UniProtKB/Swiss-Prot annotation:
Belongs to the MukF family. This is Chromosome partition protein MukF. Involved in chromosome condensation, segregation and cell cycle progression. May participate in facilitating chromosome segregation by condensation DNA from both sides of a centrally located replisome during cell division. Not required for mini-F plasmid partitioning. Probably acts via its interaction with MukB and MukE. Overexpression results in anucleate cells. It has a calcium binding activity. Keywords: Calcium, Cell cycle, Cell division, Chromosome partition, Cytoplasm, DNA condensation.
Length: 182
């Protein structure tokens, strides 16, 4: 755990004084994730406002929002992410009106967290399916061996009823969470 040199009241006062806030409704979070994906494709990590508007247009289309106001809503979303310190805006007097944007470490961390969660869910699902395959193979081998009622109950029935059924329930839950996230 981190050691903070400030007290709780000092940190609270500092956050209040600087007006720190994070608000990421689903649309804004999707926009941040889309920006992170675009950012990953750039060697220099720099994006133009036009790039961000194009990404927002895709998010807006996915959320089935009107296309007539997309430029203004994109501008509002960009300004919101800048205000929340998820994006940095760099302007130059030489290139007036052409700002360059970069994700901040906070923006990168938040997007990485959500992207990693999705990848973890996919990996977890793959592992669960592999375990089910092993359990089914073992139960099938035990069934081919034959044996008495105790053998069938212990090596075929019990693994299928408890182990495989439990894993299938877990797979179902993981898949539902992934579907909700998609």
């Amino acid at each position: 755990m981190s050691d903070f040199s400030q007290t709780v009241p000092e940190l609270v006062a500092w956050a209040r004084k600087n007006d720190f806030a994070l608000t990421l409704p689903t649309e804004r979070l999707a926009f941040l994730l889309a920006i992170a994906t675009l950012n990953g494709e750039r060697l220099d990590g720099e994006m133009s406002e036009g790039d961000l508007v194009d990404v927002f247009r895709h998010v807006s289309k996915t959320f089935e929002q009107t296309h007539e106001t997309v430029a203004q809503r994109a501008n509002n979303a960009i300004n919101d992410l800048v205000k929340q310190r998820l994006l940095n805006r760099f302007t130059s007097e030489l290139a007036e009106g052409n700002a360059i944007y970069r994700l901040t470490p906070l923006g990168i961390s938040i997007s990485d967290y959500y992207i990693r969660q999705r990848e973890f869910s996919t990996l977890r699902l793959s592992m669960q399916l592999s375990i089910v395959a092993q359990e089914l193979r073992a139960a099938g081998d035990a069934a081919e061996e034959g044996g008495d009622e105790f053998h069938w109950h212990r090596n075929v029935f019990a693994p299928l009823k408890y182990s495989v059924a439990e894993i299938f329930d877990s797979i179902d839950l993981t898949q539902r969470l992934m579907d909700e996230a998609a």
